[in-house]
Swiss-Prot record:
SUPFAM superfamilies: Non-heme 11 kDa protein of cytochrome bc1 complex (Ubiquinol-cytochrome c reductase). It is found in: Mitochondrion inner membrane. Residues 18-94 are annotated as: Disordered. This is Cytochrome b-c1 complex subunit 6, mitochondrial. Component of the ubiquinol-cytochrome c oxidoreductase (cytochrome b-c1 complex, complex III, CIII), a multisubunit enzyme composed of 10 subunits. The complex is composed of 3 respiratory subunits cytochrome b (cob), cytochrome c1 (cyt-1) and Rieske protein (fes-1), 2 core protein subunits pep and ucr-1, and 5 low-molecular weight protein subunits qcr6, qcr7, qcr8, qcr9 and probably NCU16844/qcr10. Pfam families: UCR_hinge. Residues 56-75 have a biased composition (Acidic residues). Keywords: Disulfide bond, Electron transport, Membrane, Mitochondrion, Mitochondrion inner membrane, Respiratory chain, Transport. GO terms for biological process: mitochondrial electron transport, ubiquinol to cytochrome c.
Length: 141
């Protein structure tokens, strides 16, 4: 296959007016009597299969519950707890005070107030992160 044959094949495949031919359907003999017997067999088989998974479902549910219990026993992220302690510490008290005042102003003003407390929130988070970082590194070492 040459270079131009490959290019031509790509162009033929990409053109929207390319001819697409489907495969012919498989020839199946139409028999009425065996078809009714096979449907009876399949309904009996499906009923048996439907009852079997019902017995397996409680086992699967029990396994899922055990996995959920194992997930609950996982270690709590120390970063979250350290940041919470720092937010409530003396070091971040001014930032927390400003954020709490802003939150009270915004919630008390209702829908007319266009102020938000994003800046105060970021100051509080920054303070908590800066406070918690050295403590976190010490616990991870």
């Amino acid at each position: 296959m040459g270079f131009w044959d490959a290019v031509t094949d790509l162009i033929d495949a990409a053109t929207p007016w390319a001819t697409v031919e489907a495969e012919a359907p498989a020839d199946t003999p139409a028999e009425t009597a065996p078809a009714s017997e096979s449907t009876e067999e399949t309904t009996a088989e499906t009923k048996a299969e439907e009852s079997a998974p019902a017995a397996e479902e409680p086992e699967e549910e029990a396994e899922e519950e055990e996995e959920e219990e194992e997930d609950e026993d996982e270690i709590v992220d120390p970063k979250e707890t350290l940041e919470e302690e720092c937010r409530n510490s003396k070091e971040c008290a001014p930032a927390k005070h400003h954020y709490d005042e802003c939150a009270a102003r915004v919630t008390g003003a209702g829908a007319d107030n266009k102020e938000d407390c994003v800046e105060e929130f970021f100051h509080l988070v920054h303070c908590a992160t800066q406070c918690a970082a050295p403590k976190l590194w010490n616990t991870l070492k």
